[in-house]
């Protein structure tokens, strides 16, 4: 019977662990790519509607299924602020507040502590105004029913001594693309849930779903994660030499 040295066993363990890990990573990547491809096909095969209220109405009444509709999204009761109109507007009040923390340092084996003072802008109040309904291609929808309407920072205004106001909102009358599904006779999410609002044209929305470009972006992130975990596995195996 051939006996293996401890170092050879460690090498085999490392090689085996890395091989198994690579196989799992490849399988995960394959599943992820297939998921992206399904999403891309779902958007690509949907009915495209370009600023056509009649076609949009027809798609709902005939329950055609997936739709990508492009048009203007407008608030029923817009909120005005500094010359512009918004579907919803948020005002955050912040106070410049003093805080303290204990900082401990060790030099030449001697540990000392001191109190450090620092300041941050802390939220003390939040107000939100919103149009209850929005209009899109002559159809009314509850604003809360639409997903993807992400607020954007508008401006920061001084409120006096140690007070400031942050304003965020979603601008009214934007040209958007809504991804939805009309299989039930109403507009739902294209793959379930709520219809999604994109601030892009139909062609740009479909291009953003391209699985190859999305996978390329994700691969960079996954590669870093893979390397960190692989190095951790190797580190654990090598660390076992101490025992």
Question: Which residue stretches match the model-derived regions?
Answer:
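OB-fold nucleic-acid-binding modules
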Residues: 43-63
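Soluble extramembrane regions of membrane proteins in the secretory/endomembrane system
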Residues: 78-81
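OB-fold and OB-like beta-barrel modules that bind single-stranded nucleic acids
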Residues: 67-74, 179-180
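Charged, low-complexity helical/coil segments in non-catalytic cytosolic or luminal regions
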Residues: 17, 26, 30-49, 85-243
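N-terminal Sec-pathway targeting helices
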Residues: 5-20
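Juxtamembrane low-complexity tails/linkers enriched in Ser/Thr-Pro and polybasic
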Residues: 1-3
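Envelope-exposed proteins and targeting segments
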Residues: 63-69, 89
